[in-house]
């Protein structure tokens, strides 16, 4: 079939680069340039230069074959990227000296030497690691990725970027940046107001390194930053204040002695008084030790003007700390201290974040895919969750960033904007106020559930929780990367780790009790043996609780999926409990629900398909025809490690934990189940959640009254008597694949909308992907769902005779929120011995090669079947629309019902409606001429105007009492209308046919921005 033929020009369509081939002479020239740069420009010593040259030579062949896979695709830029990556790997993994005096090199030096910025570096580095992973493993060992700490450093950069913006906004709110009234009696040249700003940021950086260890969580770092603000308020001259301490609403907490500064800052920045007091104490200690300043015995007597109307309780005043004659010296001392601290392997100079114009910062976002920062997605993304229960019932969530002319994300409103840092602090407040006060042991009601089982499971559950949480929250996980000389850091890390462990334990018991309570109401009985004795279920619950605690504090060294490795479960296991966990914790903040939503998407889109996923242990039972391919690729999961093995591996002390019984209860561990997916299972299961979402795409109906969690943790081969003889594996895989289909529908809708494709094309793409899920499931093995979607869109475009290139599809995909360049640059393939290209074994290729060599040979029959109903001209399309599909063509699957996009009324007293912002309208808003027609919550509709003014105007209009002569009719805006109008929202004519829309609205070919 011609329509299914591969594109004529493959690789160039995706990357836009040239042929991508460089001869051997060019490779030799690259080596010479790299060696010269190491010696002359960077001045590296012989040892590190030798190691760098070795890695460059061994990876040169990969570089020469990948000349279109990095950056813009130009050979010169790719060479710069590759050289920078080589040097960074050597600096982190090599045996060279760690400091500058030993010939070491920092990341900042590398970036400046190759004219790169930090954003581009982290966006392209994963592609380098994928391609050169085998070389790095051969040179530096199999643990090279862990030692490289790339994800940790990237998350650290994201945190510093957020904290610098947070500090800048707070400083500008509290102090003047320019001194309009310098002191008249000063003989010294007036200290620049910006020097105080620099002092605060440097003090924070030194505090963060010396006291909090190098990779610390966002909440602890924010507490340290607020402590620095407290020091600045006490010491910066009063003339530079932007507030009146007596009248400011920001300092409303007062005592008999004046304003309670610590309590006021805690209320303003959502910190804990106890934690802030400790942070201030650490900051004061640092000032004494490093700046050699002595605190005044009585703070209120040392500086009357700066401490007037302020309660000195808990505060320390240092004489001459920020006076003009000592400020410069204090800055120099902090600079020296910081430089000494960062002169280690591959460190980043974090001082650059205080300078918005630093060329190393670059532009763009680093948060996507690396770490999940709260507040970076709109409500629509939450509504589009494959699990309905994760969505919030509230009508609309405001954007987390306010737009400003400078693009820094700050509002000029007096009301503090909602930022990732403020959201993290608010979420931490929930953990502190709701979870921390709970007991660290099971409640009386929960103990009754435990004892009501066939065998009392109390000891088993408490012992398991102690071991698993001990493995997750070990001091080595958070404190092993310390690069300071402060001896108390280990003790501080141990205290912090124990606090987080207790929070996770309390949350686990709380949600488990809620689940048990709901279960007994359904069953009218307290015997929950089958649920409470399941090892894998409890590990998933503990992992989910720990992940929420880690996500709340935004830890850097224990980012997801670290909890999976620590607990011995897989992504597929965790996906079974997310929906129920959210459903049974009513107080869970919206940001944590969003976090779980994003995790579920990551699990579904790729992680559950990775090698070693327990999904394959069920799939091999549910689909025996796939067993040969699963075994050929070695995809089956390893047995889940025992609790004793986990305790021994992490050196967990079992003191205080219940002893392990000599004989395991017959219902409890999944030991046998993990070793063999065909284990006979005798447990019975209870009803936990509604079964409406538990529909298999293979079965027309699922007669089982059992919900997903009911059979989720059973043996895959156990028959489900309530499901018409269907095996538990079939039930579980059916649920999983139905979620995959829904996620695919959401992604297809978003991308087809951006590409302005017709509804007919959209439904064909969805039908094709659905058929691939059912009939060619192996295409997803070890791959990303977006890779299948991209190829499906191109294949359908070919059979529909649309003038749509792969480059245009990739350009549109780059603008999607879930875009990751490695999705289309590195697709997993396992060449069979009979492959026509002569290659064998595992490999990673670009999306075009995958489309030509793997996708089309596999999917061509489905495309032929789908394309047999394609009309060649407008007349036939009109006939098809009127008469339905041709008899010989399969009936297209109707596009599934997706979350409601209708406007929602947000006020009972006024006719005010809010609707989610669609992708196409978001693009329209980028036009200044069109932007004024829309009002976005939290985003100004006019340049240099704060959102508060917009809202004030709206309120004035609503409260003016002036009657509107006409009514807005929202009745026509329904799910059906929205689903059918995805492709023509920006169309000039409502009467245009779907073929006209598909062929007359080409994608603009611009420089990709992702």
Curated annotation (Swiss-Prot):
Entry coiled-coil feature ranges: none
Q: Which domain of life is it from?
A: Eukaryota
By what name is this protein known?
Retinoblastoma-related protein 1
Q: Which residues does the annotated region (Disordered) include?
A: 1-23, 657-679, 868-898
Region annotation Domain A: where it falls in the sequence: 419-619
The entry sums up its family as follows:
Belongs to the retinoblastoma protein (RB) family.
List the InterPro entries. Answer: Cyclin-like_sf, RB_A, RB_B, RB_C, RB_fam, RB_N
């Amino acid at each position: 079939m011609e329509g299914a033929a591969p594109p004529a020009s493959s690789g160039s369509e995706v990357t836009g680069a040239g042929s991508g081939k460089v001869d051997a002479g060019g490779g030799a020239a690259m080596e010479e340039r790299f060696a010269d740069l190491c010696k002359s420009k960077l001045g590296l010593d012989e040892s590190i230069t030798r190691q760098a040259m070795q890695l460059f030579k061994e990876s040169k062949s990969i570089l020469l074959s990948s000349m279109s896979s990095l950056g813009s695709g130009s050979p010169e830029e790719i060479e710069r990227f590759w050289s920078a990556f080589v040097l960074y790997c050597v600096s982190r993994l090599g045996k060279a000296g760690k400091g500058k005096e030993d010939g070491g090199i920092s990341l900042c030096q590398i970036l400046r030497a190759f004219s790169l910025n930090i954003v581009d570096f982290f966006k392209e580095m994963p592609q380098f690691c994928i391609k050169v992973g085998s070389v790095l493993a051969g040179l530096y060992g199999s643990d090279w990725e862990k030692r490289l700490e790339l994800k940790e450093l990237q998350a650290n950069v994201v945190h510093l970027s957020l904290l610098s913006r947070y500090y800048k906004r707070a400083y500008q709110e509290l102090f003047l940046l320019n001194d309009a009234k310098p002191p008249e009696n000063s003989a010294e040249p007036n200290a620049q107001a910006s020097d105080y700003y620099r002092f605060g940021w440097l003090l924070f950086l030194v505090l963060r390194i010396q006291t909090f260890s190098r990779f610390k969580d966002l909440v602890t770092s924010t507490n340290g930053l607020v402590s620095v603000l407290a020091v600045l308020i006490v010491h910066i001259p009063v003339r530079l204040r932007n507030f009146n301490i007596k009248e400011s609403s920001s300092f409303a907490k007062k005592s008999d002695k004046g304003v309670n500064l610590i309590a006021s800052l805690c209320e303003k920045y959502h910190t804990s008084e106890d934690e802030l007091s400790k942070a201030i104490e650490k900051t004061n200690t640092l000032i004494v030790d490093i700046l050699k300043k002595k605190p005044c015995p009585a703070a209120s007597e040392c500086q009357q003007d700066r401490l007037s109307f302020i309660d000195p309780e808990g505060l320390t005043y240092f004489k001459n700390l920020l006076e003009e004659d000592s400020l410069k010296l204090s800055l120099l001392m902090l600079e020296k201290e910081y430089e000494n601290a960062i002169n280690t392997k591959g460190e980043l100079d974090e001082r650059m974040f205080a300078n918005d114009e630093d060329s190393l910062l670059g532009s763009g976002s680093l948060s996507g895919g690396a770490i999940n920062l709260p507040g970076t997605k709109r409500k629509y993304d939450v509504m589009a969750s494959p699990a309905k229960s994760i969505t919030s019932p509230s009508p609309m969530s405001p954007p987390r960033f306010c737009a400003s002319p400078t693009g820094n994300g700050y509002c000029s409103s007096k009301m503090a904007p909602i930022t990732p840092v403020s959201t993290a602090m608010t979420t931490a407040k929930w953990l502190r106020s709701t979870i921390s006060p709970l007991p660290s042991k099971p409640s009386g009601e929960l103990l009754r559930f435990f004892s009501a089982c066939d065998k009392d499971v109390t000891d088993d559950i408490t012992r398991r929780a102690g071991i698993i949480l001990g493995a997750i929250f070990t001091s080595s996980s958070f404190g092993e990367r310390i690069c300071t000389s402060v001896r108390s850091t280990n003790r501080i890390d141990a205290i912090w780790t124990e606090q987080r462990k207790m929070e996770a334990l309390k949350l686990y018991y709380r949600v488990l009790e809620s689940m048990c309570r709901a279960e007994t109401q359904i069953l009218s009985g307290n015997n929950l043996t089958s649920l409470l004795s399941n090892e894998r279920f409890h590990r998933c619950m503990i992992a989910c609780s720990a992940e929420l605690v880690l996500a709340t504090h935004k830890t850097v060294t224990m980012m997801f999926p670290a909890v999976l490795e620590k607990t011995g479960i897989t992504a597929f296991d965790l996906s079974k409990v997310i929906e129920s966990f959210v459903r049974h914790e009513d107080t869970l903040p919206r940001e944590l629900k969003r976090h779980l939503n994003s995790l579920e998407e990551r699990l579904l889109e790729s992680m559950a398909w990775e090698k070693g996923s327990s999904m394959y242990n069920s799939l091999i039972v549910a689909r025996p025809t796939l067993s040969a391919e699963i075994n050929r690729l070695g995809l089956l999961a390893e047995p889940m490690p025992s609790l004793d093995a986990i305790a021994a591996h992490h050196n967990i002390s079992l003191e205080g934990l219940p002893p392990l019984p000599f004989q395991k209860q017959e219902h409890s561990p999944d030991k046998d189940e993990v070793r063999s997916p065909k284990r006979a299972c005798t447990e019975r299961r209870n009803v936990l959640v509604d079964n409406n979402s538990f529909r298999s795409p293979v079965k027309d109906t699922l007669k089982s009254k059992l919900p997903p969690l009911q059979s989720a943790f059973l043996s895959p081969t156990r028959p489900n008597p309530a499901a018409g003889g269907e095996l538990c594996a079939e039930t579980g895989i059916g649920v999983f694949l139905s979620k995959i289909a829904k996620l695919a529908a959401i992604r297809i809708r978003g991308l087809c909308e951006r590409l302005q494709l017709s509804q007919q094309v959209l439904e064909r793409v969805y039908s094709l992907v659905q058929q691939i899920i059912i009939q060619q499931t192996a295409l997803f093995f070890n791959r990303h769902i977006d890779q299948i979607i991209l190829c499906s869109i191109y294949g359908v475009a070919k059979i529909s005779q649309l003038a749509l290139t792969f480059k245009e599809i990739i350009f549109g995909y780059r603008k999607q929120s879930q875009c990751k360049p490695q999705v289309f640059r590195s697709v997993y393939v396992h060449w069979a011995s009979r492959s026509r290209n002569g290659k064998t074994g595992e490999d990673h290729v670009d999306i075009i090669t995958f489309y030509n060599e793997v996708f089309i040979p596999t999917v061509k029959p489905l495309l032929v079947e789908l394309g047999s109903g394609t009309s060649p001209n407008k007349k036939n399309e009109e006939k098809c629309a009127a008469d339905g599909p041709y008899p010989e063509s399969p009936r297209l699957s109707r596009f599934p019902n997706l979350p409601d996009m209708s406007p929602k009324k947000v006020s009972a007293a006024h006719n005010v409606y809010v609707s989610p912002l669609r992708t196409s309208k978001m693009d329209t808003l980028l036009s200044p001429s069109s932007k004024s027609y829309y009002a976005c919550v939290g985003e100004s509709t006019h340049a240099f105007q704060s959102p508060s003014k917009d809202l004030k105007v709206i309120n004035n209009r609503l409260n003016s009492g002036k009657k509107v002569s006409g009514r807005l009719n929202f009745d026509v805006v329904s799910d059906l209308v929205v689903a059918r109008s995805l492709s023509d929202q920006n169309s000039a004519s409502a009467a245009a046919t779907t073929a006209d829309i598909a062929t007359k609205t080409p994608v603009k070919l611009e420089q990709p921005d992702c």
